[in-house]
Amino acid sequence: MTKEEFRNAVVEGIKRVKGLDAVAIADDETFTHAGLDSLDSMNLVLEVEGITGLNFGEFNLSDANTIDEFYGKAGELLARGA
């Protein structure tokens, strides 16, 4: 999965969680910049799992609070074949 594909999945997830038509967030901006709180972040992980087919398990977005960091975690999962 390319970073652009993952980024698109995250943006789509944010739109679904927040009920928005569009989201503007840079790869290095925190998810709070897009208006997500801790509950929204948990829901975002679930949305991204559904879109990408990845299983993040008990992953907490506070450990990766930007698209760049979240993609790094996804890369670890892909490397392990998750």
Predicted features by range, described:
Residues 2-34, 40-45, 50-82:
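Phosphopantetheine-dependent thiolation modules in NRPS/PKS and related acyl-activating systems
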